[in-house]
Regions:
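Short regulatory "switch" loops immediately downstream of catalytic or recognition motifs
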Residues: 1, 50-54, 181-189, 265-273, ...
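Membrane-embedded alpha-helical bundles of multi-pass enzymes
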Residues: 2-224, 455, 469, 496, ...
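N-terminal cationic-hydrophobic initiation segments that often serve targeting/anchoring roles
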Residues: 30, 111, 269-273, 311-312, ...
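Short, conserved active-site loops that position catalytic residues or coordinate cofactors/metal ions
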Residues: 31-48, 73, 240-241, 278-295, ...
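Intrinsically disordered, low-complexity coil segments
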Residues: 55-59, 187-201, 225-230, 270-280, ...
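Generic structural signal for well-ordered alpha-helices
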Residues: 103, 107, 265-269, 404, ...
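Membrane-interface segments at or immediately adjacent to transmembrane helices
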Residues: 152-156, 209-283, 292-312
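Solvent-exposed soluble domains appended to multi-pass membrane proteins
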Residues: 253, 280, 285-549
Length: 549
């Protein structure tokens, strides 16, 4: 008898683990394979089924199953972080999974007091509330926001111009819960207790949730089919120097890197030499191209001097490049938690910056403000910077800006074309990214260095998220990546032209200049705010119910 029970338990456990693996695989595919975003619309069903079966079987320690499910999903989709930092990659996988599992655990806890569909509604809105919180948290890693599943299925989500990516998260939850609800009612027999009208309403509602967003997307997308043919445009020259960041200073000096970059630019600009009548052109260099910039003292930089000297022959050319930049501060006291002591009352603040310059030496600078945890940013600096000092300063201490600022392309008559420049990781943050447009950006640029991850899905995912930003803001993007993939992206998110990975390349094209603002730009992340509000209300109701008994 005991043997039969043991065999039965093994079968039950096997079913649960199969559902765990099925969830992880289905939800990973949209992040890895183009045009598979629709899988996310039912990818959560195995996880929900696992939880329901485990509850019916009165399994103990169900958290092991759902935590394992999230770990496997995170590992399959973001393993590539380990190429840059093994410790950071493992921390991202396990810590991110822990937060997901905590949200799911809260849902299981709510089932003790909430009945019917309410616990599942609580799960959906709390998950989206957590995603919204994650965008602004000190330790932030919103890579696997459910709405990002459609980053390479763009035809289905042109309505992101209204909702942003969290609208996609809501769609994922609505479809999964709708289908799961129908499956549950069929499996427990309650479906047969519904009258014809109730059955029709359930099926119709489920179909509407699934199909209507596709129709809306098609209707909205038609408005922008000629978006690249705007009355005004900016010519861009994207230069991908293809310099291995792991050997950046061992293999080549900065002067040699400058020479490589300028040689590539000169070949494309030959016809513009000393032409004062040509339309302005913007040249892009990648993130952290140089590391010799002192803020406010640009003429001390060999790279800056070399660039401005080169540009004197091209009065219509503006150059945007990335740099590690520094502020030196003389103070008897530490000016900030992130400042590093240099000695004799001198302190150093570091930045990951984008600079715009031209033949006149005019220089504008923007500091990246959404920073990679540990690599660039020490979270909760009042606490962890002190610990980091004791460890010898192993964590990044970059500082950003309090608010976004724009960079200006100038023509030969001194007229400005305001553009935004999202530096690398900033392009993952949808609502933050809209600030560039609200400030007046007529087009967008992204500069990045994705080579740290090697030839993995990481740089492809990063590129695809830029397409979502284009849809949300309806601004074309010129994207420059050190080793690829550089691209020109239309306001519909379509990649108009692109370079190859790990290849020196120059990409030339025009990006339209626009002044309109989408609903998402004007109003922000309404989906996230509403879900946060509902989550708090339901959580308070849950606490009250627990305290009442």
């Amino acid at each position: 008898m005991q043997t039969e029970k043991t065999v039965e338990m093994k079968k039950e456990n096997m079913i649960l683990w199969v559902l765990v693996l099925l969830f992880a695989v289905i939800m990973s595919v949209p992040f890895l394979v183009p045009h598979t975003g629709m899988l996310a619309l039912f990818g959560l069903i195995p996880l929900l089924s696992m939880e329901r079966i485990a509850t019916m079987l009165e399994k103990k320690r169900v958290w092991i199953y759902h935590y394992s499910a999230f770990v496997i999903w995170n590992a399959i989709t973001t393993f590539w972080v380990c190429n840059a930092t093994v410790g950071g990659g493992l921390f991202a996988i396990f810590a991110n999974s822990l937060q997901m599992s905590a949200v799911f655990g809260l849902f299981r806890w709510s089932k003790r007091k909430f009945k019917g569909a309410l616990p599942y509604i609580f799960l959906a809105v709390t998950w989206i509330a957590w995603e919204r919180f994650y965008f602004d948290a000190e330790i932030s890693w919103p890579w696997l926001v459910l709405g990002n599943s459609f980053a390479r299925t763009l035809w289905a989500v042109q309505w992101y111009e209204i909702t942003g990516a969290l609208g996609g998260s809501l769609w994922v939850w609505a479809c999964n819960l709708g289908i799961f609800g129908l499956m549950t009612s069929l499996s427990d027999g309650s479906w047969w207790n519904f009258n014809i009208k109730a059955k029709a309403a359930a099926v119709t509602g489920c179909m509407a949730i699934l199909i209507v967003p596709f129709i809306v997307s098609a209707l909205i997308g038609r408005k922008y089919k000629d978006a690249m043919a705007a009355p005004e445009s900016l010519e861009t020259l994207i230069i991908q120097p293809n310099i291995d960041p792991y050997n950046k200073f061992q293999a080549l000096t900065q002067q040699q890197q400058n020479a490589i970059f300028l040689d590539m630019a000169a070949k494309e600009l030959e016809e513009r030499r000393n032409d004062t009548t040509a339309a302005p052109i913007l040249i892009l260099a990648p993130e952290t191209f140089t590391s010799d910039i002192i803020v406010g003292q640009y003429d001390r930089s060999l790279t800056w001097r070399r660039f401005t000297s080169f540009l004197k022959e091209y009065p219509d050319v503006n150059l945007l490049f990335g740099a590690s930049s520094y502020d030196y501060i003389q103070s008897p006291l530490r000016p900030s938690h992130t400042a590093r002591k240099m000695g004799n009352g001198l302190w150093l603040e570091s930045h990951n910056s984008a600079l715009m310059t031209d033949w006149s030496g005019r220089t504008e600078i923007f500091h990246k403000s959404k920073l990679v945890v540990a690599v660039e940013h020490t979270p909760y600096p009042a606490v962890f910077c002190r610990i980091d000092d004791l460890l010898g300063g192993v964590m990044g201490r970059c500082t950003g800006q309090d608010e976004i600022s724009l960079l200006n392309v100038k023509d030969t008559e001194g007229q400005n074309i305001p553009i935004g420049c999202a530096v690398c990781y900033e392009s993952v943050y949808g609502e933050y990214y809209t600030d560039y447009i609200r400030k007046g950006a007529r087009a967008m640029t992204i500069i990045t260095n994705d080579a740290w991850w090697g030839d993995t899905p990481g740089y492809r995912q990063h590129l695809s998220y830029a397409s979502l930003r284009a849809i949300e803001t309806r601004r074309a993007i010129a994207r420059c990546a050190n080793t690829g993939i550089s691209a020109i992206i239309s306001p519909t998110g379509e990649i108009v032209s692109e370079t190859q990975w790990w290849t020196p390349a120059v990409l030339e094209g025009r990006i339209p200049l626009r002044d309109d603002m989408t609903f998402f730009v004007v109003h922000g992340d309404i989906t996230g705010r509403i879900c946060t509000f509902l989550s708090i209300l339901l959580l308070l109701a849950l606490i009250v119910r627990f305290r009442s008994f």
